[in-house]
Design a protein with these regions (language model features):
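Cytochrome P450
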Residues: 1-291
């Protein structure tokens, strides 16, 4: 799949790497895991963008024409587009009950343990988490390799670096900037008292560039070891459910890049998503020089 995407991108006149490459692999992968038809994937993930990028005018569907937004209170990010995703999820669940397959959508729709609302919200979670962050990880990877061509040459010359290269790309890109946690017990963290029930924001991006944890953290080093990055949450019960799928996608991406792409060349400035939650690129003009 990644090979086909790159082959298409190499002959595609559109130089926006996000559109031609980075968004396509995770969209198709998570769609197939969930049992979503390929033809529905683009629309579904357009809705997902509208939900999660609520602070960016290019994507947002924030409600401005009413004072009372309480009807949206229980929707993710208070986004009305969530309802469209929920409606799609119910149609998919009904179809899977009639004609099940070996996908996650079929397994979840056949479960008596989930209410319709729980199925809807879990489906939306998988659509967002299985797509958005990996897309940005791949975009940041391409930008990093455009700016550090020596590292691409190094990886191509020594494929044994692939495991450490994957982890370094994950550390470097850190698509999820932060998450909030709730302290379960009274504790103390580096001299700061934290009471049970306190909300604590964990800044993954800060941890990934912590000079106390990494040697030269602002240097891209595809052979970095050890690499105790916090991109997936740093461990514990809240570690990212899709960590292994994300690692697989990054690895396949790098393997195919080494085979097919000699160089990435910047064709314009990258455009960031307006968000303090997601470290994302919505446009990345790159020229791809084939091997």
């Amino acid at each position: 799949l990644m090979s086909e995407i790159l082959d298409t991108a190499l002959v595609d006149p559109d130089d926006d790497f996000v559109e031609t490459v980075a968004r396509r692999l995770p969209i198709l992968m998570i769609s197939r895991v969930l049992g979503v038809p390929d033809d529905d994937a683009a629309q579904l993930f357009h809705w997902a963008d509208s939900v999660v990028y609520h602070a960016d005018p290019e994507f947002a569907d924030v409600v401005f024409d009413r004072d009372d937004t309480d009807p949206y209170r229980l929707l993710p990010f208070r986004s009305p587009t969530s309802v469209k995703v929920f409606e799609y999820a119910q149609r998919l669940a009904e179809a899977k009950r009639i004609d099940p397959a070996g996908d996650i959508g079929s397994l979840l729709s056949d479960s008596d343990d989930l209410t319709a609302q729980e199925f809807n919200t879990f489906f939306l979670l998988l659509v967002i988490a299985g797509n958005e962050t990996t897309r940005h990880g791949l975009s940041h990877a391409a930008l990093a390799l455009a700016d550090h061509p020596d590292q691409l040459d190094r990886l191509r010359a020594d494929p044994g670096l692939m495991p450490s290269a994957v982890e370094e790309i994950l550390r470097w890109s850190c698509p999820q900037l932060h998450f909030r946690r709730t302290a379960q017990v009274d504790t103390e963290l580096r001299g700061v008292s934290v009471a049970a029930g306190d909300k604590v924001v964990t800044w993954y991006i800060s941890a990934n560039y912590d000079e106390a944890a990494f040697v030269d953290p602002f240097t891209l080093d595809l052979g970095r070891s050890p690499n105790p990055h916090a991109t997936f949450g740093g461990g514990g019960p809240h570690i990212c459910l899709g960590a292994w799928l994300a690692r697989l996608e990054v690895r396949v991406f790098l393997e195919e890049i080494c085979r097919k792409i000699h160089r990435f060349h910047r064709a314009g400035p990258p455009v960031r998503i307006r968000s303090n939650f997601i470290n994302g690129l919505k446009h990345l003009p790159l020229e791809l020089e084939p091997s």
